[in-house]
Amino acid sequence: MFGYVTICEPELKMKDLRKYKAYYCGLCRKLKEDYGTMGQMTLTDDMTFAIILLSSLYEAKNRMNQHRCKVHPVKKQAMIENEITQYAADMNVLLAYYHMKDDWADEKKVSGLLGGGLLKKKAEKIAEQYPRQSKAIRESLQELSDCEKENSQEIDRSAGCFGRLMADLFVYKEDMWEQTLRRMGFFLGKYIYIMDAYEDLEEDLRKQCYNPLKRLHERADYEEQIRQILCMMIAECSAEFEKLPCLLDVDILRNILYDGVWNRYNKIQKKKLEEGNKKNEQESL
């Protein structure tokens, strides 16, 4: 359910692209250092966005280093780390753990059992350190599980579960920016959930799996409705972002919010157009 909140590379200046990659590689290294290969496998662009956002807002002191890794064994890569990197790594692992645990409980996925088992002890320590975030993740995933069992087609209800989860993860400190960050995370979380459901719909229909968009899909204006909902979520999220006094890396953040979040949507539209053209060609033969 991740990977939607990323950069639009063609629209990003080279210096900003290098810096984004340095934040991303810094998170990857922190996950490997603290949680091993399994932790590293939880790496997402979405949490990289959270690092850049919170680092900009709280003016975190960045540490720039150069390191090699398995992906780049020859040339050293620039890596940025700060106090937010640690927080994002912890949240990444905590969310992955509860998600794997939920996968095993609901669908008996072996990957959930094995992955959750490997992360269990470390995730429990993180949960003790961050009880508010841990509670939010558990409760949100439980409600999402309930939505699936009930085959709920209330999009706002199911998306709201993930929205509340992300809202709590975005709140690094309970201070004057808490409510703005909470609203920003809420709408971004809803966007991620709906985008994921939209991307998975065809497969879910074939496999008869739960998807909150099945009823909406029956409408003639389904595509237009989805685009309007997604636009609304990102518009609300971006409006909250603009209330924050972020100056550092603001061009990267705006690139993600105004362009990058649409990468996967645009790919889906391109694929649907190509499939439609191919079908028309076959019918005309």
Where are the regions that the model predicts?
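Acidic catalytic motifs of isoprenoid enzymes
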Residues: 1-183, 190, 194-231, 239-252, ...
